[in-house]
Amino acid sequence: MQARGQVLITAAELAGMIQAGDPVSILDVRWRLDEPDGHAAYLQGHLPGAVFVSLEDELSDHTIAGRGRHPLPSGASLQATVRRCGIRHDVPVVVYDDWNRAGSARAWWVLTAAGIANVRILDGGLPAWRSAGGSIETGQVSPQLGNVTVLHDDLYAGQRLTLTAQQAGAGGVTLLDARVPERFRGDVEPVDAVAGHIPGAINVPSGSVLADDGTFLGNGALNALLSDHGIDHGGRVGVYCGSGVSAAVIVAALAVIGQDAELFPGSWSEWSSDPTRPVGRGTA
């Protein structure tokens, strides 16, 4: 299977699995910056058999201080979550959302960092499923308890590459900022106390790797995007955003074309919390 097929699944492919009766665990990870709790929307309509996962409460650990707005969960707490969701050994997992692939990319990153195999993002999310004529169910889904084992208790040192704040600021890595340009420039900052970016970072908004319909760009377009920003394919790349959510979209997009990338989980919310760290503003 090519890299793209290891990261993404199309609505047609998923529908085929469901119709064939093939086992699959589907996680609904709806999350928006302005509406972080997607549970009500989930209850109103979701993919058949999908289980809701809270990005805020289950894919983050807010008891951790000093690591940004969405610290990574512990392996133990994540194992309880994925077993609640019915995830089993050797059963594929599909994650989806309805906005900008942020929720599903975060789930994909967290689950794969934990050592869970065969996790894919529904390309285009819920809109793609609806456009393909996929059926929708309502209400809560409570599956049989799963048995999957999380292999890493510390996801900061799990199976996906990460950056610390010190590493993000030390150079030696091409650092990408996945936030919208106005936040990168420091024109506005709707969430964190300080506006701006990590000096030396390149602004590659998470939305720039998606087509108008919310699917990931084709491999050729993704490679061209790297070239346009002067990013060497195969070189060391780090990615951050506000708090380690939308940056996962860029990490996933790079994985689609076989490029590893290191996520800075604390991102700008961690970096900017220390007044001794430098702040870049403007386009450079």
Curated annotation (Swiss-Prot):
Chain residues that bind substrate: R183
Catalytic activity: thiosulfate + hydrogen cyanide = thiocyanate + sulfite + 2 H(+)
Active site: C241 (cysteine persulfide intermediate)
GO molecular function, one term: thiosulfate-cyanide sulfurtransferase activity
Keywords per UniProt: Repeat, Transferase
Pfam families referenced in this protein's UniProt entry, alphabetically: Rhodanese
EC class: transferase
Gene3D superfamilies in the record: Rhodanese-like domain
Protein's UniProt keywords contain Transferase: yes
InterPro entries in the cross-refs: Rhodanese-like_dom (IPR001763), Rhodanese-like_dom_sf (IPR036873), Thiosulphate_STrfase_CS (IPR001307), TST/MPST-like (IPR045078)
EC number(s) reported in the record: 2.8.1.1
Domain Rhodanese: 20-138, 169-280
Domain comment (free text): Contains two rhodanese domains with different primary structures but with near identical secondary structure conformations suggesting a common evolutionary origin. Only the C-terminal rhodanese domain contains the catalytic cysteine residue.
Note: Was identified as a high-confidence drug target.
Protein name (Swiss-Prot/TrEMBL): Putative thiosulfate sulfurtransferase SseB
Species for this entry: Mycobacterium tuberculosis (strain ATCC 25618 / H37Rv)
Lineage: Bacteria, Bacillati, Actinomycetota, Actinomycetes, Mycobacteriales
